[in-house]
A protein has these predicted regions:
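NAD(P)+-binding Rossmann beta1-loop-alpha1 motif at the extreme N-terminus of oxidoreductases
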Residues: 1-43
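Rossmann-like NAD(P)-binding element
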Residues: 45, 49-87, 91-96
Length: 97
């Protein structure tokens, strides 16, 4: 499967590593840019991409970002086809809202 993980932190990075090891075509995007993706994630075979390029042509998109910033991605998802699976692993932090 073609999978994008948005968020290169502990959860997103580990998911990218495991999904790559399982043979999936994985790309990772982070709001801080491709350079924010940790070396061990890239060594797994996942590719770092710009956030603007992260959602096109993918079967699955995994959100691994803080809960409070998910709404900032609305424009990014405007052109995502209805059949694309979106999985949200976002974290809620007390005091975030």
């Amino acid at each position: 499967m073609k999978i994008t993980v948005i968020g290169a932190g502990a959860i997103g990075g580990n998911l990218a590593v495991k999904l790559s090891a399982a043979g999936h075509d994985v790309q990772v995007a982070d709001a801080r840019g491709p350079e924010a993706v940790r070396a061990e994630v890239l060594e797994s075979g996942a590719r770092a991409v710009e956030l603007a390029d992260a959602v096109q042509g993918r079967d699955v998109i995994v959100l691994s970002i803080p809960f409070g910033v998910a709404g900032q991605l609305a424009d990014l998802f405007a052109s995502v086809p209805d059949e694309t699976v979106v999985i949200d692993t976002s974290n809620y932090y007390p005091g975030m809202l």
